[in-house]
Amino acid sequence: MLQELLKNHEIILASGSPRRQKFFQDLEIPVKIDVRPVDEVFSEHLKKEEITDFLSVLKSEVFLNDLKENQILITSDTIVYNEAKALGKPKDHAEAVKMISSLSGKNHEVITSVCFTSKNYQKVLNHSTRVYFSELTEKEIEYYVTNFKPFDKAGGYAIQEWIGLIGIKKIEGSYFNVVGLPTHEVYKTLKEMLNS
């Protein structure tokens, strides 16, 4: 649908996430992948979407001097927000187990911010989805972390994997946001940018 509008533009996706890359493929939006290292440090005073907004903009800053007129850069960040704490990606097995255990039997928010940057324009959007976990046993959590190694996933889990199939009883908001990108909002924003 956007192919005609995109013919004079190049979309750069600054994400190493295979899930985000697949979303763009499924949306039929061709992207150039360009991932640059960024130190994802934020002030402890930031809460919820303030964190993801800040990080998605921060990830764009390393590209600012290189962007050409016809390019649109997309950067994003996802966190799991539970009990007034942001959970990023677990650094090891023990931390993944601890994260999932803290989510068991409760609900939490998955917040994603997406930053669209061109040479003369920047827009940030964010989306929040509430996720409800059933009570999980220690054995189930151990099994999941051992077999699925969710170390590249915010909160230490992926909704589309085994743990989501057996443990998530309901969500309020976008499923795709929990996977890593509020696709409906990304599509809408790109369409608006390309039509302006």
From Swiss-Prot:
It catalyses: dTTP + H2O = dTMP + diphosphate + H(+); UTP + H2O = UMP + diphosphate + H(+). Keywords: Cytoplasm, Hydrolase, Nucleotide metabolism. The record marks R19, T78, Q160 as: Important for substrate specificity. It is an enzyme of class 3 (hydrolase). InterPro entries: ITPase-like_fam, Maf-like. Its cofactor is a divalent metal cation. GO terms for molecular function: dTTP diphosphatase activity; UTP diphosphatase activity. Pfam families: Maf (PF02545). One of its GO terms (cellular component) is cytoplasm. It is found in: Cytoplasm. SUPFAM superfamilies: ITPase-like. GO terms for biological process: nucleotide metabolic process. Nucleoside triphosphate pyrophosphatase that hydrolyzes dTTP and UTP. May have a dual role in cell division arrest and in preventing the incorporation of modified nucleotides into cellular nucleic acids. This is dTTP/UTP pyrophosphatase. It comes from Christiangramia forsetii (strain DSM 17595 / CGMCC 1.15422 / KT0803) (Gramella forsetii).
